[in-house]
Amino acid sequence: MAHRSVIPFGPQHPVLPEPLHLDLVIEDDRVIEAIPQIGFVHRGLEKLTEKRDMHQFGYIAERICGICAVGHSCGYASACERMLDIEVPGRVQYIRTILHELSRIHSHLLWLGLLADAFGFEALFYRSWTLREQILKIFESTCGGRVILSINEIGGLKHDIEDSELAGIVQTLDAMRPDCEALVHTFLDDNSCGERLHGVGVISKKDALELSMVGPFGRASGVDYDVRMFDDGAYADLAAFEPIVATDGDCYARCQVRCAEVTQAMDIIKELVGKIPHDGIGGRTKLTPADGARGEVVIEQPRGEAYYYVRGNGTKNLDRFRVRTPTSQNLAGLTHALQGVLLANVPMIILTIDPCISCTER
């Protein structure tokens, strides 16, 4: 019988941007079992809802995660609006969607850079993050912040994004597109990338469904599910698009899905800017939720489905705020994907799942 050993992977590791710890049970240089451990950056953000005015808590909700900050802000505000039975103007919905899709581009370009860095393709890492910088500049010019945008509030937006600024966003994305397409071509067609990604960390569609995998991780295994199309967080009525789905279920397929979603997000933004309404941006509400009033919403974050739940208690403070993030859904898929793989491929597989531990632990 081959000798088995346990190798600790993380929480501090050069290839991981966040503190995920795995105990890897190894036999003959292959992973037999992966046991995840989280809890290193738990901050108790949900508990803080009992001590903060629900409008003040919007700042905290946006800080659940830096990469997905605008998504968490939209999710929290939308859940509170449902609890208070507020219907925001169409322009608010459009601007939130535009910012959310910009966040998706930002997240995927950041991830592509980390993936390139993981297999030693530093030039590709620089190219990915150079393009990402253009999205951060858009955020800064329209909202004042590069990461935390602080534009959403319960009932609408704190300030408008002018039509001239929206047109500038489209111009920037049009200028970026050739470079993005060249970047995607390198990732998907270059042999040095393909050899590291093809056939690694395979998860079948059947397993993906049984493990309730979400986001690009699930769609790369053939799961045709995108909240933007099929759930109460959908905005397919605002723009025409279809979910990006691959079938191989390996690291290459996950890269394929995210690469396609970058250019798809550009198309969505361009369409939204072309038909955005001019019916105002709402504003902060003075309503107080009734005791026991509830609101919930599901949105498609860059990493997958995120669920937001709020409950009022008759005061300005919320009684409960709950978030279920995509990484918590995908951890079971991660441990499954690692079974039987070579130890050298572990960092690659973890990165293609794109875990966000800050979101997961809160």
Model-derived regions, located:
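Active-site bordering "gate/hinge" segments
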Residues: 1-362
